[in-house]
Amino acid sequence: MNNSLVAVLAALCLNACTVSGGKEPDEGTEIDPLLSAQTLAYKTVGEAFLTPLTPADNIDSPASWTAPDGSVWLIATAKATDKLVVYDGDTGHTRTAAGGSGAKLGQFRRPNGIFVADDRVFVVERDNRRVQVLALPGLQPLGHFGEAQLSAPYGLWVDKTAQGYEVLVSDAYMDGEAVPPAAQLGHRFKRYRVRTDGGFHAAHLGDFGDTDAGGAVRIPESIWGDAKHGVLLLSEEDQHAGTQLKVYGRDYRYAGLTVGKG
């Protein structure tokens, strides 16, 4: 199936190094910085539609899938109500929802990042500390992985390979309530190989993350990759370090380049 994913990376205002209560690492203050107030060049894209306003869901990340009949589904994580919401990709109308609170297959706790590859949906669950995989179009759960390695997962990127799927997951583990020192940031991103043919199989391949000031990601969330050009874009959401994208190569090393520092 054809897949397109719209990734929106926004600058978020953070306090110096701490978070409190039920807030996430990228929710340190009540002030929401606006891109229009920054010096970065940007373009405004007009709205194609508006989905229903459901603030209780706290809709977070979207992914899209093209069904066999050509219709487009927009699948989003509802991190406050622990479910996936499926919208019509042409009108924005709600098609269906799936999930519910819990740790069983098909249930979620604080779903955040989402990615569609072929007819598979990969969903990061922060509070279950795992990634769950479901099959489209029925959203049947196939399996989950990552509990042994992940502490506070948020974003992910999936690359189809000859061995199945390579899955990269960001992990915003903390040192208590503080961002860890740079020397401890070498595990910010986890790598997995996942296969769903002939059963569900997942293996942890290792961790990566620069520990030098230039390439270290202090507060990670979204990940995006360009497999053709061998580039990974890793979001840095620490405002005091400068919200930006850190550019890594497919060798999982910092490429010495940042984009959009604000």
Which residues are covered by each model-predicted region?
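Conserved beta-strand positions in repeat-built beta-propeller and related beta-rich domains
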Residues: 74-80, 123-127, 167-183, 232-239
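Short loop/turn segments that connect beta-strands within beta-propeller blades
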Residues: 88-91, 135-138, 194-197, 248-251
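A short beta-strand motif characteristic of beta-propeller blades
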Residues: 46-55, 93-105, 140-146, 201-214, ...
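A short helix->beta-strand "capping" segment at the edge of beta-propeller domains
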Residues: 31-57
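C-terminal motif of bacterial Sec signal peptides marking the signal peptidase cleavage site
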Residues: 15-16
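Asp-box/WD-like beta-propeller blade repeats and closely related beta-sheet repeat scaffolds
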Residues: 129, 136-188, 201-214
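Beta-rich, blade/repeat-based domains predominating
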Residues: 54-68, 103-117, 148-161, 210-231, ...
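Beta-strand-rich domains and repeat architectures in extracellular enzymes and scaffolds
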Residues: 48-83
